Amino acid sequence: MMALVCDTAVDDIEDMVRITDVTPLQRQAARKSVVPRARKHKQETGEQMQTDSVIPGMQKVWLKTWGCSHNSSDGEYMAGQLAVAGYQITEDSSDADLWLLNSCTVKSPAEDHFRNAIRKAQEQNKKVVLAGCVPQAQPRMDYIKDLSIIGVQQIDRVVEVVDEAIKGHSVRLLGQKKEKGKRLGGARLDLPKIRKNPLIEIISINTGCLNACTYCKTKHARGDLASYPVEELVERVRQSFQEGVCEIWLTSEDTGAYGRDIGSDLPTLLWRLVEEIPEGAMLRLGMTNPPYILEHLEEMSRILQHPRVFSFLHVPLQSASDSVLMEMRREYCCADFTHLVDYLKERVPGITIATDIICGFPGETDEDFEQTLALVRRYRFPSLFINQFYPRPGTPAALMQQLPAHVKKQRTKELSALFHSYRPYDHKMGEQQQVLVTEESFDSQYYVAHNKFYEQVLVPKRPEYLGKMVQVEVYECGKHYMKGRPLEEAPLRTAYTTAPLLKGQVSGHTQAGVCEPQCWMPDGMRILAVVLLLSAVLLALLMEKLL
């Protein structure tokens, strides 16, 4: 294993997980039923009896997701299972019977949005089910008291929880999936899902991590590392391409740590997946922390040069000060990070390195912060995620002596100003690039594409471009994007042999012809359900009068 550049003494990473049994295990099948929390009322009211008589599976559900691509993937799986069960997934929150709120606990503002959404749902008398990292990490918080929760390891049972919530019961499934005492990666990868973008498949390759960062709340929710077996991931990629996907995102809390719990590693997985990527499709690797990628730099440089893999890597630094990194328990030093970046830049020409910086961590001095500014000036990262430090409840960093709010805010502004002072793409004016077109821009004026280095290129909004590889000439450069003029003589290239699924269509549960989100319950079953529902309501009213 490649030695870390710094001399900081840290525990051997491989000592942090048990790998005595490396045999991949099958995920547990979902339970058929769930026991709702018992009511304490001695006598039910007529309204409660009518609620209990409601037949679930016909209502409209609005799903809102905050946070990372792992959370987005969980949301897609939950939407797919609910649609297969007969629920209609709606984009109109006001029209929904139930709100499924999939939360993020990384930063305080994200949790604030989550809390506000709960309050708004209650004001509108909506049924509510909570998901994601916030309720998993802190299920006893007052503002989620008595609300139903689906844990991050239990998303394959979302239908059970929503069914009970629709009937007025409070249900909480927060356990971990284990078999023979070994933690599993999570829900099965072959579950039905509704992709937010039918052209992009987001695959979680592992859940949890090996770190114990002092500021991180996600660890409380996602837990320790648990990787999916290579063969399951390969099969999921195959299925995705069979459904018209042209771009694969691999995600997790730390992709670089993949496989350490099952006797494998990230390069082994990537070489297997590369074999499955058809011409005209691309693979994007998600975030990796520095310690776990250092020993694989040579292999990773070859993988990132592959024509069907984006030459892009997201490696969070957080601070260029070794003393701050030590207080964060990041298990690397700044020299490790610079070695990684320099190595990849030399061997993967043009590679995009994205990174994260936390401004105002407890104990950060002016000198510490200046070291971070100097490193950003040196590398001029085209993609830089700047975060003002917010102490998260229950983390060691929340107990440390905090910096004044105005200091944290000022440092955040200073780093942001530095980031916006340079333009990373101006030298690419006039270049000819091959780009993969996957989505519509926020203003609906362009299609959004990405070149080999995962740099954003806007192209004219022509239907024939979507899902295709297009040859363009760059004619305009902005801070965060380029604009490309398609070369008419260059042929369009596509990865798929079958058309992509329609927006709202369920992956792994397709039907012939056009399939709207509400079509997964046969008409006869819907009619029977309506009859049973009306009968139950009439019976409840009759019993109320008799009592």
From Swiss-Prot:
Catalytic activity: N(6)-L-threonylcarbamoyladenosine(37) in tRNA + (sulfur carrier)-SH + AH2 + 2 S-adenosyl-L-methionine = 2-methylsulfanyl-N(6)-L-threonylcarbamoyladenosine(37) in tRNA + (sulfur carrier)-H + 5'-deoxyadenosine + L-methionine + A + S-adenosyl-L-homocysteine + 2 H(+)
The record's free-text note on cofactor binding: Binds 2 [4Fe-4S] clusters. One cluster is coordinated with 3 cysteines and an exchangeable S-adenosyl-L-methionine.
Cofactor(s) listed in the protein's UniProt record: [4Fe-4S] cluster
GO (cellular component) term, any one: endoplasmic reticulum membrane
Upper taxonomic lineage: Eukaryota, Metazoa, Chordata, Craniata, Vertebrata
Positions contributing to [4Fe-4S] cluster 2 binding: C209, C213, C216
Subcellular location: Endoplasmic reticulum membrane
Every Radical SAM core domain range: 195-426
Record InterPro entries: Elp3/MiaA/NifB-like_rSAM, Methylthiotransferase, Methylthiotransferase_CS, Methylthiotransferase_N, Methylthiotransferase_N_sf, MiaB-like_arc_euk, rSAM, rSAM_horseshoe
Every TRAM domain range: 426-488
Species of the source: Danio rerio
Family membership noted in the UniProt record: Belongs to the methylthiotransferase family. CDKAL1 subfamily.
A single GO molecular function term of this UniProt record: 4 iron, 4 sulfur cluster binding
The protein, known as: Threonylcarbamoyladenosine tRNA methylthiotransferase
Stated role: Catalyzes the methylthiolation of N6-threonylcarbamoyladenosine (t(6)A), leading to the formation of 2-methylthio-N6-threonylcarbamoyladenosine (ms(2)t(6)A) at position 37 in tRNAs that read codons beginning with adenine.
Disordered: region residues: 30-51
CDD domains reported for this sequence: Radical_SAM
Topological type in the membrane: Single-pass membrane protein
Domain of life: Eukaryota
UniProt key word Magnesium: no
Enzyme nomenclature, EC number: 2.8.4.5
Cystine pairs: none
The UniProt record lists the keyword 4Fe-4S: yes
Example of a GO biological process term: endocrine pancreas development
Major location category of this protein: endoplasmic reticulum
